[in-house]
């Protein structure tokens, strides 16, 4: 028989899992009948439909962004709020993206009427990525801010003034938030902030980030809300990732506060499916309700003289928040470790436990943890080989994640069966119990050193286990129900703190989270191995066979359902790339799964396997030859160069003659450029793959961008590239072939034009008296003269130079050098019958014995 203890344990696991699932579902959306002082999801959705009903993407600086901005200003005016626009300044992110955001700023007075009163900021961003309309990220938050303003005005003013910031450029690198925090007069009075964002289109709203000294903040939050979903592991894990929101800027400014987001429907994030049809009113309502309560609590609190200190914290099924001060939790974890050793040692001395058996049980638990890690990674490899999961580096989200989540849960069940079977031969019940308690206490002590905010995970069940270990000290035999009850009590405490992590784990990390899920369950469920060990041979066999069957069914189900669907699509980018230096053009497809859909290969001669998108981008890309379109390439003009203390300095001007939406300058690794100066300020460049670095300008002005930099090496390659967020008309055939289960994402489908040239800053720039501008295909003829002097302006593209004269003399590569801004480089001109194909990028000079250059006429 299975055994009552094991059956009760399985029922307990199922009940706690269902309770966690229910807690992490957003509540029913509130309707228009909601009292005026409360947040109404229905009213917020009406505002959202009015703001982005046209469904157009609105990236920073776009015409659509200007239209949306005007609508937001109109809504604020209807609410009696007088917004101001913060404009005009160039801002760059920490990863080399620059733009000129336009922020919407307003102030709601508080009862503290002093001009320098401490204020609370309420923030959201109104820009979207170029690929999608951003209904949830972050249009829903903008609508929520407007609904919160309406609800605030239904009550008397708050104690502290509230500053509204609806900023632009978050998607481009938190540009609007940086501009506000650095330059707006109201920023100096802000002491706390509430930020709203989304990394999906649905799901429960989570408090995933707070200010630094957050013990008082969590206390404030716990008292303000009746339903709270948060824990300090979210906060700790988020700090270890490269992701950032506007709240990252606010934290860096020293402001306290709360950062809310929902992450359900993450497969639609930053795609065209982030639209009104997929925006969940329940998520909007829950996030708005939480933000309103948190904002009112902050606006009534003491923002300066609050108690210091951070806390570890977690919610209990969304009904309450348990707070543990970190200053006390660290010594408490070490004390627990000492108590676990002491109680276990006392039990050994009294003969209740056998030390070798406890050590053997500990080895079994450690081995199961290692095996869970190895087994999880192996299962990922197998599922990738079966094409159930995308390859490493691809999109980590699939359409039916429940299949693989079930498989990894079953894998952890097999580890439990293994623990119980081996432990039955090497130890008894209390010896395995003591080993579990020692493992939990040791893990808590280690986490207290390295990740203290996560140390509560093993500490809570560890405390329960050490207290229960006092029971066998009486020296009497305990009935079976006492032993089973002891194991299930600790199991309940372990699952209560662990399941809130397991539920959103996949949504946060995708496929890489699956082995972590298995390990987390193995670390949380060893207490279930105790009644399993006592279940009898038939019970253990039935449990092992059942979990193996679940694993098999999950894998078969994963094989039978599609990896991607129209509702949870693969992210696939299409690009038209024109290399003006080489005179080549390509259709490029970048599938996030790293696999090229067959329909494209059938239509065009795409490369057989993926290759890196560029020397600075490892994204897997497939290319096919495309027609060369008459697109003006971006221009680099070298204004000055000289020796500097760092190495070599230069001043440049970048221009996009075709007025592209983005303009970038990339430096080869030997340059070692790490900062550029634009508008008198120094900004960091992005450090890319292969040692390349870049600076990128969004919506650059028509006359271009002037910048300066310092490089270590005097000579290095640079690439100037501009980009638009659409494909040329000739790409229609590719767009029609796009599979239904794929969508563009992030920047969307793009057209890029690039030129590559070599700069040598050790030479003086060449004066430009003999310069002309040539368009692609222009024929330029010279008078008959060998070794004619020629100068070509940087704005020219690849062209053809026809010379009337001894072509072999003029184009003898052994005697001819081209120069770019005065720099001697390898020859770029190759003789081709009676003409030469020249890379007309930069300023070229062909030395001539003639005293006067021959005139050149088109």
Can you say where each PLM-predicted feature lies in the sequence?
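Ser/Thr-rich, low-complexity intrinsically disordered segments
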Residues: 766-858
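C-terminal domain-closing interface element
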Residues: 188-207, 331-352
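Extracytosolic and intramembrane catalytic regions of membrane-associated proteins
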Residues: 70-78, 82-94, 99-107, 117, ...
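Ser/Thr/Pro/Gly-rich low-complexity linker/stalk segments immediately outside membranes or between
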Residues: 23-39, 563-573
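Soluble extramembrane regions of membrane proteins in the secretory/endomembrane system
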Residues: 27-324, 666-669, 681, 686-712, ...
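Hydrophobic membrane-insertion alpha-helices, especially the h-region
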Residues: 6-20, 544-557
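Alpha-helical transmembrane segments of integral membrane proteins
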Residues: 336-626, 630-637
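Juxtamembrane/start-of-transmembrane alpha-helix segments at the extracytoplasmic/lumenal side
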Residues: 316-336, 399-403
